[in-house]
């Protein structure tokens, strides 16, 4: 009878050892652990602001057809495509109005052609 208990005891120990090797969770080492300190780079999705002149004909690019833009991390110039509307000239009689925010002034509108604002001019109100 003692032999039966010894046999059952040995079988239980063997089963326990077998289960502990098959079911153990592998421990992470420093080389296999994910780097929780690293942050994702979301700058590509950051809000982008570009600065145009507003007019009765729509938004106008600057005379050099290179629009100043910025995101939360960087400033850059974005070249306007050919035939985009651009600010050709400003009426010098209303130049003082430009210094006052949201005051309309007379301006001439052209179109971008290889990085420069070209005519024929169209007249508009700008602000």
Swiss-Prot record:
Subcellular location(s) of the protein: Secreted
Q: Which GO terms describe its cellular component?
A: extracellular region
Instruction: Kindly list the cysteine pairs connected by disulfide bridges.
Output: 50-69, 65-112, 86-117, 107-126
| Origin superkingdom | Eukaryota
Effect seen on changing residue 54 to A: No effect on binding to CCL5
The reported result of mutating residue 52 to A is:
No effect on binding to CCL5
Relate the outcome reported for changing residue 39 to A.
Significantly reduced binding to CCL5 and slight reduction in inhibition of chemokine activity
Q: Mention one GO molecular function.
A: C-C chemokine binding
Q: What is this protein called?
A: Evasin-4
Set out the biological process GO terms recorded for this chain's protein.
negative regulation of chemokine activity
Q: Into which family does the record put it?
A: Belongs to the evasin C8 family.
Which residue positions does the secretion signal occupy? Answer: 1-23
Q: How does it assemble?
A: Monomer.
- Describe what happens upon changing residue 70 to A: No effect on binding to CCL5
Whether Cytoplasm counts among this entry's keywords is no
InterPro entries per UniProt: EVA_Class_A (IPR045797), Ig-like_dom (IPR007110)
What is the recorded function of this protein according to its Swiss-Prot or TrEMBL entry?
Salivary chemokine-binding protein which has chemokine-neutralizing activity and binds to host chemokines CCL1, CCL3, CCL5, CCL7, CCL8, CCL11, CCL14, CCL15, CCL16, CCL17, CCL18, CCL19, CCL21, CCL22, CCL23, CCL24, CCL25 and CCL26 with nanomolar affinity. Binds to CCL3 and CCL5 with 1:1 stoichiometry. Although binding to CCL25 is observed, does not inhibit CCL25-induced chemotaxis. Has been shown to reduce cardiac injury and inflammation in mice through its anti-CCL5 activity.
* Record organism: Rhipicephalus sanguineus
The reported effect of residue 51 to A is: No effect on binding to CCL5
Q: Would you list which residues are glycosylated?
A: 54, 64, 70, 77, 83, 106, 114
